Amino acid sequence: MSYQVCFKKYVKMRQWPHVLSLRVYASYFLLYNNLPLSSAMVHDGVHLISIKTILTDQPCPNTIYYAKYQVQRKDNEDAASLLEDKEAYLRNQDCIVHAKNDLLFVYDFQAIPSIPEESSSFMLLNSGAFSRLALFQKDELALLLDLYINFLQGLKKTVLYWLCKEYNFVPIYGVLLPLKLHPSFDTQLWNIYGYPVVDLQLSVLSKGHIEFYLKPTRQTVYRLSEVDNLVKKLDTVIRLAPTGCLATLTSVHANASAQTVDALKHRYGFSLTTTSKWVGVTLESSALEFSWPLELCFLETSALRMNDDSLSSNLTDLNNLVLPSNVVNNKKELTEFANEEAEASDKRKEGFTEKEETADAVVTLVPSHSSSPVNYSINSAKSTPASIKVNEEILVADHNVSDDILMEEIDDVGITEADFDYFDLPNVEEKVEMIEPNFANTMTTLDNEEINTSISQSNTSPNLNTHENIPKQMEIQSDDRMVTEDLNPYNVEVDIPEISLNISDSKIPTSAYMPSYYSAVIFPSSISSIFQKYNYGGKYWCPSPSLSTEDLFESFSVAESVTSTDEDICSTNFIQQDFTMEYNHDFFSSSKTPTNISEQSNPDSNYDTLSLAHQVLMNESKSANFDFSFLKSLDLQPTITLGKNDLLNAILSQNLWFRSLPFWKSMTTSFMMSQDVLNFSSYMRKPIRDYLEKILLGESSAVFLSKSPENYLSSINNGHHALNDNPPSQVNFSETLVNFSQPPRVLLKYNEKKLSLDSSAPENWISLCLQPYGESKDFEVFLLSSKSPDVSSKAISFFYDVQLAYENCKLGKLNLSETSINERVMGFSTNINETDNYDDNETTQSDTATSYEQLASVCVNELSGKNVLFFYFLEDDSEKLLKACQHFICVKDSIKRLGDNKFEDKSLRICTIPNSIFDSPNSHTTNSNSFFTKVSLDIYNNDPLLMDGSLKRREPAFLLKKPLLSTLNYQLKDINPRSSALGEYALHVTYTTVEEHLLICNWNDSYGEFETERRYFLQDLEIEDALQQILEVTFTFLNSMHMDWIVIVMKIGEMSDAEYLFWDQAIIPENLQGNVSLTVGYCSAEHGPGSTSKVFSRIPYSASSTVIRNNSSHELSLVAFIREMAMPVPNDEFKKISTILARGYLALDEDESYLPLLSIHLLISRNHDPYLMLNLILKHYLSMIYLQFRTYVSFSSLPLHISTVLYQKQLLQFMASDITHPVTS
């Protein structure tokens, strides 16, 4: 099979709104079946072709290239016809396609999933559909490297477009200018208006992985609209956004241009009006005068205050900028064009028209014949500025024209002026005489050094050097000079040097390395949900260059420079948020419980139930016999007057508070449901509240969480008081919750006298947030440790890092308290009741420790009226956290009893630091660990806990132990690898019936590439007929793929005998493309205390001892927790039909005490071991549900609106194991 595909002489990259300097005015591409792919692409410089026809002037963010081609039928008419059919189907799709031989490869941006921090790979198949395989693995890179490179550029352009559109970024000379800042940026805290310029970078990592991140440049620009006296800035060189042109400010008042408003709106997304302020400017390259919106004019200067009179004399060097075609980087005085103006006037009278025919188009420049400002336009709906004239000789200057396989057919191109798309410079509205073009023979070119520097500053991948043969330059004739323009839109051969800071402070090393920005630049899975994936926790930029100048420290706060969260994404303007968040004490209150812990404490009990519960939980996997002797030291004293809420708030305000929950250390798998953090208020608030409250009140239902409550009770009753006479009838739901994954955050560290972003954060990190936004607060600090001799030097070194970073972020000062207590790091006693010591070691520690009464006395006598911060350095253990919080509460209570009313709650703060923060690979070989210390001064409060308005907090409870990536890493590999035991794809056919009226079926493949849903009304047909239609749809889909398939049919709800017989007798057609096996089962929901008690006694799955039905297989069942089981029917006819599945949120309902359970039963398993099939189903369910929560995209293998979460601990442990055989219960 052989045929030729001829892409006729024309491929153009559309003028993207953010990279005006990267234009391809004309090019061409031809691919013969006997020409190697890489050779053809390197030769012509065009990689991927989209066959979407140019139908609109609107920029399409999902399509990069446009092409016109025709299929030349040579040897095979059918193949050419097939390709044409594909072209017709894809004509109106936002795709990028590539034709080779008889294959048509399609890149579809809509189909690419958005999975931050996870991996997904894909390959283009001959069907044109997506299938995530190994496109970017090393063995494929040799052949598909060009496709790969261009695809990366497509990703980059898409991300750039949406940054500009959604976040009000402004493209300026090929880089980005973030304009959306905190609302107080312009009015409250800042007295300078510098905007750091960032560059979107992409890098190619090992195994074909790619990553995006924002990188700082040395440029800082200032909005001309924020200059108080514009008259003083006349004749000042400015930069025009988004074109990037250099211009001179000639007038502070000018008429608006409707043409410019329209162009900026449709091509750049700027919603401007003609009523906004406009200024008159003159292009430096051509002396063309016109008007421009004031808010899109910028000054380029060093970090000086705007009221500095020497501003114009401190302009930064612009030689490193990438300039568009109509700009040259040398300033010309207006007097230079006096004679040209006279000549232009004569030519205007003669009414000349000049045409020039090029390799791909005929460009006609037509001047206006009126006294109004001149319009230069091409003879089409498009227009071009007067400075543009294409030179065909320069277009092909870098390669031999005689070797060009297209030049012999150049007359057949059929390209017209309409194929060119230039930005229209506005009409000149100033009252000055216009200058007509004067085509002289003079030519001005950029120096080679400038060109090279310009290329080196481009935002490209540093690792791919495959385009040496692409034409680097094209010369464009302007009115009296020739401008050399960079013509390499891919820029893949460029190495990006490390950016060094231009630092004015002599105390800061000028060669200091500035790490890359950590940027959650999300890749769009759909147009509407581009940035919804990181509507929490995402930090898109932070002005590190500004942090390096001392002037900025006087009024700088990181909080004022970070993009906001949910509200900002849906709005072009910032929504003022109240960052002063108070505790809601009622959140942890209950009408059934008093506010004082001591009132409910059992005076006869020798054990503090709070620590008792945690000791049980943290040791449940080690031994059934527990030593409770240490708990004796934690009895709450009757003299404590502070209530339960104070202790709870102290715990929840700490980084480590998650570890006080029983499920923290019990989860060992990698299935971290990070998206569940967003749903905190919906399913976790009440369990945590109940759990902590009941433990504080001594109720046993929150204590007995082990697998065998009876054995635990037995061990308790052997020598200790039982907390409850009756064993619990149910297992508390606290253990069923999963671990959390924290949103990405920017890390700041102070190292080598420079505050910068840390791109290599370790696993252990902390967040420090001591006051609301916009406040500066000083603290007197006490450093306390339960092991002061061992941690003293490390703690002081750590504190100094925090102190310097805190001060340089202009948050205030942290002063190591100089009081009558001389120890720099004090020990604190974990034995609250020091009169009743039980251990010699504890006694020794207590004798040398600083008691809470002593600390309270020092605070009252020496620090009255000041803010005091207690730094507790603790072992990485929940027990120590609770002791430190209890110690802090005792200090507050003692201060209160001493009668000092000057200390308010906000004046006393606690911060717990785990000793594990000092752990590092080199910690055993060095005495100083400050170099390895990573401190997160995360004052941009976007904790998901705070999203719910009912929970107000001043400090967020950040997750401590969580790795943090330095960049957003798109690892293009599969999130759901094929089962090593099976090796086939799985198609999940899941259906359910709503009463007896409606059947809903959903098809998903295990890789999330195929998903569809159909509804069948059972009034019109029997259920067997509906199942037969489902089977036909299934086989139709299977027959379209050349691969082996496992078909998994699962019903939600009990399966009737008629349904079972249908599936048991189902015949798999023999004419399918691959081998197909069938597995059939059902999922059922169980409710009630009786069923929940079985959960912790069941092994991950069990097999019944009896053979069921027709002896086809054993019935396998598995019990798992359900977060939500509901089937809302979107059809009006069935709105009143109650669903068969109950809705449950882990017993959050006040009136319900049961847990909803899900049993998965396998009835039929043809051609596969049923236990391996159950293993496969569980893995698919877990991973696909995980994807659904992470991406807001329904990749669930259950029908839509059924979100099943398998939370059980044994289940997750089973998923990480290699169990392949059943265990009978």
UniProtKB/Swiss-Prot annotation:
One of its GO terms (molecular function) is transcription coactivator activity. It is found in: Nucleus. It comes from the Eukaryota. InterPro entries: Med13_C (IPR009401), Mediator_complx_sub13 (IPR051139), MID_MedPIWI (IPR041285). One of its GO terms (biological process) is positive regulation of transcription by RNA polymerase II. Pfam families: Med13_C, MID_MedPIWI. GO terms for cellular component: mediator complex; nucleus. Keywords: Activator, Nucleus, Repressor, Transcription, Transcription regulation. The keyword Coiled coil does not apply. Its main location: nucleus. Belongs to the Mediator complex subunit 13 family. PANTHER family: MEDIATOR OF RNA POLYMERASE II TRANSCRIPTION SUBUNIT 13. Component of the srb8-11 complex which consists of rb8, srb9(TRAP240), srb10 and srb11. The srb8-11 complex associates with the Mediator complex thereby blocking association with RNA polymerase II and leading to reduced transcriptional activation by Mediator. Component of the srb8-11 complex. The srb8-11 complex is a regulatory module of the Mediator complex which is itself involved in regulation of basal and activated RNA polymerase II-dependent transcription. The srb8-11 complex may be involved in the transcriptional repression of a subset of genes regulated by Mediator. It may inhibit the association of the Mediator complex with RNA polymerase II to form the holoenzyme complex. This is Mediator of RNA polymerase II transcription subunit 13. The lineage of its organism: Eukaryota, Fungi, Dikarya, Ascomycota, Taphrinomycotina.
